[in-house]
């Protein structure tokens, strides 16, 4: 079995946990710190997409890549709408300061989808690993500032860290994906 194939299950989990660990010990000095971290994460994935994925996709003339790209953009817009701007470091917790369920579900769905290509494109594993570090940091800050108990906070963080590996497992073992 290819080592990168195996790492596709483990590295996204480790990246998210590493980001959360960094966030636990280091807090940003300004509110713009989170936005800069997320800007790096988004720009990094955009660079991988433009320099690595798109040239590879467009070499196959039989594949209708344009439809999938448009579908992916629409899905990303929907996820951004549901997450209420959290991917830009912009959150508004309600007065009770509980984590909005739709925000958490949309971030988990995003992480699950990130895990799907890792078994077919093992070269993406390190890119997703690096992407998960700042995402883990930001999610830690969001969840840690809620009024939930520590047990619930850790449960939310643990569930999020499992989403990308679950996406990899789903594409590997479920035929309908």
Where are these regions (language model features)?
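Intrinsically disordered, metal-sensing/regulatory segments
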Residues: 1-177
């Amino acid at each position: 079995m290819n080592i990168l194939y195996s790492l596709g299950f483990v590295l996204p989990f480790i990246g998210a946990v590493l980001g959360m660990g960094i966030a636990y010990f280091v807090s940003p000095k300004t509110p713009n710190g989170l936005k800069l971290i997320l800007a790096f994460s988004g720009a990094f994935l955009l660079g991988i997409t433009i320099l690595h994925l798109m040239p590879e996709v467009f070499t196959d003339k039989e594949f209708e890549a344009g439809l999938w790209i448009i579908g992916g953009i629409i899905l990303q817009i929907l996820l951004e709408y549901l997450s209420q701007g959290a991917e830009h470091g912009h959150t508004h917790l309600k007065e009770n300061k509980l984590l909005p369920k739709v925000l958490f579900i949309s971030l988990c769905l995003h992480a699950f989808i990130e895990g799907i290509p890792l078994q077919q494109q093992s070269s993406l594993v390190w890119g997703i690993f690096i992407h998960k570090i700042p995402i883990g940091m930001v999610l830690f800050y969001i969840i840690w500032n809620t009024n939930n108990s520590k047990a619930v906070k850790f449960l939310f963080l643990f569930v999020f860290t499992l989403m990308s590996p679950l996406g990899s497992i789903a594409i590997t073992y479920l035929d309908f994906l």
